Amino acid sequence: MSYKLKVKGQYIKDLSFENQNSPQIFVMISKTPPEINISVNVSSVSLPVKAQDQENGQSLDNKVEPLYEVTLQVNAEARVGTTVAFICEVKYCGVFSVENSDASNGEELSQQDMRDMLLISAPSILFPFVRELISRITATGGFPPLMLDVVDFKAMYESQIKQNAAEQNDNGQHTEK
């Protein structure tokens, strides 16, 4: 495959950190380590943008450069018993293009390869930035830095496909009595 995923930009789209039970929670976590629950989600949307003429900067109405926004959402919640220690929610996005590095071969990118690039490769590029961001936010919030484990986005994607197929089978096999 001669296609490359190119990062056009990346940014924080949404960020929230809640530490509503301070300062009492700091006494609680000094005695009992918090239980931390983490969820990770990935989504992508197409962002059609008109291509620009390189020489004069004018819009080329007949060409569209396909761009994609990939969102990596990570939610982390720490609890001591039933008391919330903190909630950290991050939506971190990247704008990507998929470019043919060998335009002479005329090879089309399959939908499956495109999904792999956008839902496996792109979040793998974004993840280190999200991991660092969450580590700094939790430390700034007065907690030990939360270091996220590496995420296997391929396994996550395959699991989601299996779950969707199972849900479709359940919906398709429903019979009325």
Swiss-Prot record:
Organism listed in the record: Ehrlichia canis (strain Jake)
Keyword line: Chaperone, Cytoplasm, Protein transport, Translocation, Transport
Main location: cytoplasm
Name the record gives this protein: Protein-export protein SecB
Role played: One of the proteins required for the normal export of preproteins out of the cell cytoplasm. It is a molecular chaperone that binds to a subset of precursor proteins, maintaining them in a translocation-competent state. It also specifically binds to its receptor SecA.
GO cellular component entries: cytoplasm
GO terms, molecular function: unfolded protein binding
Localization: Cytoplasm
InterPro entries: SecB, SecB-like_sf
Keyword Transcription appears in the UniProt entry: no
Gene Ontology BP terms: protein folding; protein tetramerization; protein transport
Domain of life: Bacteria
Pfam families in alphabetical order: SecB
Subunit annotation: Homotetramer, a dimer of dimers. One homotetramer interacts with 1 SecA dimer.
Family affiliation: Belongs to the SecB family.
Upper taxonomic lineage: Bacteria, Pseudomonadati, Pseudomonadota, Alphaproteobacteria, Rickettsiales
